[in-house]
């Protein structure tokens, strides 16, 4: 490995380590009741034991930090959601419930950062673009699954695939981040079961009843 590549690798490792450290502090402050807008860089770098210049050497501002995290989170969700989008004509309602649980597990890991992301949508163009891009990918993926299911007889053929995917994905996006941040565990279980029932009865159950 050349000296330049070694330095680049070390720089990326330092950036990743610093990002994890700073994000942990931001999450702690969010849990304490602060909004993302109320968190200032001076307090974060002081707690992290780094200088402001070090922070800004890696991140343009705190919103950049949030966008980088959200892009990584999107990849985690896209990995988890494959358990749903890979279901076929043998899938049961319990299979759907288990697949959706994997997605919910991804959201459960960082509810405060998700809430901060949605808070920032209103005033940060970059965050808004990151969320919109992620949602387009989620919607396109579900649309493809619906179309495949319709072609193979296990999803209701009367549904408009693109529009159905749009509604199901936006319902889940808003519902999941609010549920995991605001509802007690007992309510979360009931809400998760209701989510799975909505998906099953909207997409798969009609095809089963008609013998598809």
Where do the PLM segments sit?
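Amphipathic alpha-helical packing segments from all-alpha helical-bundle domains
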Residues: 79-82, 105-109, 125-152, 162-166, ...
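N-terminal intrinsically disordered/low-complexity leader segments
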Residues: 1-17, 158, 181, 207-212
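Helix-turn-helix
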Residues: 21, 32-64, 68
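Hydrophobic/aromatic-rich alpha-helical bundle segments in the mid-to-C-terminal region
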Residues: 128, 150-197, 206-212
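Hydrophobic alpha-helical connector segments
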Residues: 68, 82-109, 161, 168, ...
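Short helix-capping/turn signature of helix-turn-helix
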Residues: 59, 119-123
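Generic hydrophobic, amphipathic alpha-helix propensity
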Residues: 14-29, 44, 69-77, 142
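Helical hydrophobic small-molecule/effector-binding pocket
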Residues: 93-118, 140-144, 169, 204-209
């Amino acid at each position: 490995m050349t000296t330049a590549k070694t330095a680049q690798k070390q720089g990326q490792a330092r950036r990743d380590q610093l990002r994890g450290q700073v994000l942990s502090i931001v999450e702690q402050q969010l849990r304490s009741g602060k909004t993302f807008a109320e968190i200032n860089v001076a307090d974060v770098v002081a707690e992290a034991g780094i200088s402001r210049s070090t922070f800004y050497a890696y991140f343009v501002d705190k919103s950049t930090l949030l966008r980088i995290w959200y892009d990584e989170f999107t990849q985690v969700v896209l990995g988890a959601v494959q358990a749903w989008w890979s279901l076929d004509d043998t899938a049961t309602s319990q299979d759907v419930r288990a697949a959706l649980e994997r997605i919910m597990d991804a959201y459960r890991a960082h509810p405060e950062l998700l809430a901060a992301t949605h808070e920032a949508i209103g005033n940060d163009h970059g965050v808004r673009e990151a969320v919109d891009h992620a949602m387009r990918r989620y919607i396109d993926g579900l649309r493809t699954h619906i179309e495949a299911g319709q072609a193979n007889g296990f999803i209701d053929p009367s549904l408009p695939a693109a529009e159905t995917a749009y509604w199901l994905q936006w319902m889940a996006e808003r519902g999941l981040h609010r549920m995991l941040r605001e509802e007690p565990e007992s309510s979360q279980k009931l809400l998760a079961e209701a989510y799975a029932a909505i998906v099953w009865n909207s997409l798969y159950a009609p095809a089963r009843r008609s013998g598809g």
